[in-house]
Amino acid sequence: MANEGNLPQWVGNDPMMMEYMRDEWGRIAHGEQVVFERLCLELFQSGLSWLTILKKREAFRGAFAMFDPDVVATFGEADVDRLMSDARIVRNHRKINAVITNAHATLALRDAGGLDAIVWAYASEQPVELDGNGMLPTQSPESVALARDLKLKGFTFVGPTNMYALMCAIGVVNVREALGLV
C-alpha cells in the first residue's frame, strides 16, 4: 500500500524522507566520493532509522569533509575527539573509526578500479522480489559477496544488510521498479 505520492507505506509521511525517496533513493549514482559517502551513511545508520541519518546528513558532510576519502584518511585522534564531541552527528567511536579505516581502504582500491567499480561489479540482472507484505529483502547473495569482498580489502563495519541498503540506495539493485517508483 502506498502513501501520498505513491511511495511505499514504510516511507512514512516525513517530508524530508518522502523527498529523499522520490528524488534520490534507488537512482543510479556513480563516483568514488558519492559511493564512499553513501557507504559511510549506511554504516552510521546501523541500529538507527534512516530518517535520523538523513536529518543529520548535512552535519555529517561538514564533519567528514564532504566525505572526501583523501581528507578523511588523514584524520587522527584529534579529529576523532572533535567528531565525538559534535552533537550534530551520531557520536559512536566504532563507527567514526570505521569511516576513517574505510577512507584508507578506499584510497587503496584506486589501483584496482576504485570503490565505485567494485560496488557496481555486484549489480544483478535478477529482479527484486518483495515479500508477502510488500517489503524489500534485507540482503542478497550479491550483498553478502560485496561485504565479504570489501572486508578482504580492508573495510570494516560492512555487512550484508548495510551493503544491500547501499546497493539499493545508489541503484545497483533496481528497487524502484520493484516498488513501482520508476
Each language-model region and where it sits:
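HhH-family (HhH-GPD) DNA N-glycosylase catalytic core used in base-excision repair
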Residues: 1-182
